[in-house]
């Protein structure tokens, strides 16, 4: 799964059978030189692996990848491959086991280094050791060297009572810790977006508002189809299927961007939703991010 989302083109149902996927290896052969499969074959291969893992029904947390964690990754997988119904089914099941944080819990938990919290399904940093600490400290140091994107600051400015505004200071320097974790809030966003793709607007709004209600501390107003904000101007202009953003889809993607800020999600969101080209400036030079 991780190789597919990094090294293959984003999944499109209409072209997956023609798009190149990964070389598939399911047995050891030192002389083998497998050619690349199609993206559809790659997805089928990954799903078979997930299903095999689930057959063990592991509940022992010492093995890390228990059945609920496998199902959480399956929700991500179905979401990436645009199997919206299955994405909803698996995400809902795991969301029931890992409840999201309320606003007061979020403040205390989001920057936790080692302490597990009820919403974290799996995380990469679980104990102190020299190598992990070096990587952890390097990540926190490096992120201080570049201000938070003004477009993201403007997005947060639309909801001044959002508890996540504390993720950066007035100089646009991040105060949120760079982390690698899989939180149940992502599952809520998967459900909301999947429902939107299926044309089930009331259900999409329900899950979008479920997360928003836990992040906006004062003067919270639930979104309806009548009061959704205009499409937010950003690099992403189309959804995962290539359709121009609607107000609902824009609201969901913006919520995801705010919630998963500095958690390794943005690159994949750009890839999944149209692969927009854009540029940034550094030291007087222009650097273009081409279609990827």
Task: Put a short name on every predicted segment.
Residues 1-59, 122:
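Aromatic-anchored glycine-rich loop motif in surface-exposed flexible loops
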Residues 82, 86-185, 217-239, 246-251, ...:
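Hydrophobic-face positions in mid-chain alpha helices that act as interaction patches
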């Amino acid at each position: 799964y991780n190789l597919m989302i990094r090294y293959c083109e984003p999944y499109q149902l209409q072209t997956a059978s023609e798009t190149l996927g990964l070389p598939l290896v399911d047995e050891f052969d030192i002389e083998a030189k497998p050619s690349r499969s199609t993206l559809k074959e790659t997805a089928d291969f990954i799903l078979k692996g997930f299903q095999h893992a689930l057959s063990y029904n592991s509940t022992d947390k010492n093995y890390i990848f228990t059945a609920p964690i496998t199902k959480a990754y399956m929700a991500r997988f179905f979401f990436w491959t645009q199997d919206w119904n299955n994405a909803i089914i698996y995400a809902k099941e795991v969301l029931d086991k890992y409840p999201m944080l309320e606003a007061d819990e979020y403040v205390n938990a989001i920057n936790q280094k080692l302490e597990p919290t009820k919403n974290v399904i799996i995380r990469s940093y679980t104990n102190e050791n020299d190598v992990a600490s070096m990587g952890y400290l390097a990540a926190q140091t490096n992120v201080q060297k570049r201000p938070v994107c003004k477009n993201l600051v403007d997005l947060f400015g639309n909801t001044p009572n959002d508890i996540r505004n504390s993720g950066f200071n007035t100089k646009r320097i991040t105060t949120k810790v760079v982390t690698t974790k899989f939180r149940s809030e992502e599952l809520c966003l998967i459900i909301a977006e999947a429902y939107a793709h299926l044309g089930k607007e009331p259900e999409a709004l329900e899950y979008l508002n479920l997360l928003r209600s836990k992040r906006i501390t004062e003067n919270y107003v639930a979104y309806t189809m009548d009061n959704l904000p205009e499409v937010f101007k950003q690099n992403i202009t189309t959804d995962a299927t290539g359709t121009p953003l609607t107000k609902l889809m824009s609201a969901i993607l913006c919520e995801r961007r705010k919630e998963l800020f500095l958690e390794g999600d943005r690159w994949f969101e750009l890839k999944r939703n149209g692969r927009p080209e854009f540029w940034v400036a550094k030291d007087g030079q222009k650097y273009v991010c081409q279609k990827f």
